[in-house]
C-alpha cells in the first residue's frame, strides 16, 4: 500500500462579499435568501434521548437513521409514519453514519466501538467488522462505490478505510496532515472517494487502487464538514467554522466560497443534493435551524425554518424522487422535506445514504 502524499492545490476564488475588514466580518449578515416553498414533516423517535444522527435512504425508499445514544438503528415508513427500531450487537457502539447496500442491508459505523456493522432488516441479525488497528477507534461516514466496496472515514484516528463486504478485509490509510479529522465523504463519477478534513482547511481524495491521498487546500480558516458531489464532479461542502458554502473543482483546484444566508456564525452542517442538481444543507448555528437550497445555475439561496427547531441537523439524504430525509439530533426527531424537485441528470450524492454501489 502506498503511503499518503500531500499535493495541495491552492487556486482559490472568493465571491466579492467575502472580502470584509476583520473588524466587520464577525457581524456581517449573509446574502439575502428567498422563501423556500417546501413542506417539512417530523416524527418523534420512540426511544427518548436517542440522538438520531444520520439518515439514509433504504432500497425500498424507507427512512433509516442511527440512534447514537440508544445503540439502535431506526426505520420510518414515510407513508404510514410507522417506526421500527433495531437493537445492535455491541453495547454502546455509538452508531453514527449509515448506508444501504444493493441487497437492502444497512451498514453503519460504530463510532464508539471501532467497528462497522451490517444489519439485515429482514431478520434483525447484525454482523460486525472490527477495525484492524486500535487507533481506528471511531469510524465515521460510510459510502459505497460502484464496485460494492464500502469506503469510510475515521475521524479521530485520522484515517480513511475500505471494507470488502465479500471477504471482510479492511484496509486503512493514514492522512498525512496531523489531526485532519476526516469527516464527510462521497464518490465521484470515476469511482474516486473524496472526503472533508474537518480539522483543517483541506479537502482530499484517495486513489481507490493505490490508497494514495491527495489534499486540496481551501481558504484559510475554512473547516469543511459535510460534502456532496454534483453531476459535473464538482465537490460542494459546508464550511462549519466561517459560515460558507464552498465548491471545489478537483480538476483545476479552484475553490469558490459563498456566504451562507445566516451569516458567519450560521454553522452550515448536514447536506445533500437532489436529482435536479440543487444543493441543500442546514444551518445549525441559527435558531430555529434552517433548510437552505442553493441553485448552482443562478448562485442563489432560498431557505425555510425547521418547525421543531432542528436541534442540529447533522446530515441529510436525498431520495431518487427529490425528497430529503433529515435527522434532528437535539430534539429527537426525524424529518421529511417535500421539495418538488424534478430530475434533470443523474446525481451522485456524497453523503452517507448514497446508493450507487
Predicted segments — roles?
Residues 25-38:
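Blade/loop signatures of beta-propeller domains
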Residues 41-71:
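Beta-strand-rich domains and repeat architectures in extracellular enzymes and scaffolds
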Residues 41-45, 84-87, 127-131, 169-175, ...:
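A short beta-strand motif characteristic of beta-propeller blades
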Residues 48-60, 91-103, 134-147, 177-196, ...:
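Beta-rich, blade/repeat-based domains predominating
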Residues 63-69, 106-112, 150-156, 193-199, ...:
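Conserved beta-strand positions in repeat-built beta-propeller and related beta-rich domains
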Residues 72-75, 114-118, 158-162, 202-205, ...:
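A short loop-to-beta-strand structural motif that recurs across blades of beta-propeller domains
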Residues 77-81, 120-124, 164-168, 207-211, ...:
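Short loop/turn segments that connect beta-strands within beta-propeller blades
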Residues 311-357:
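Blade-level signature of beta-propeller repeat domains, shared across WD40, Kelch, NHL, RCC1
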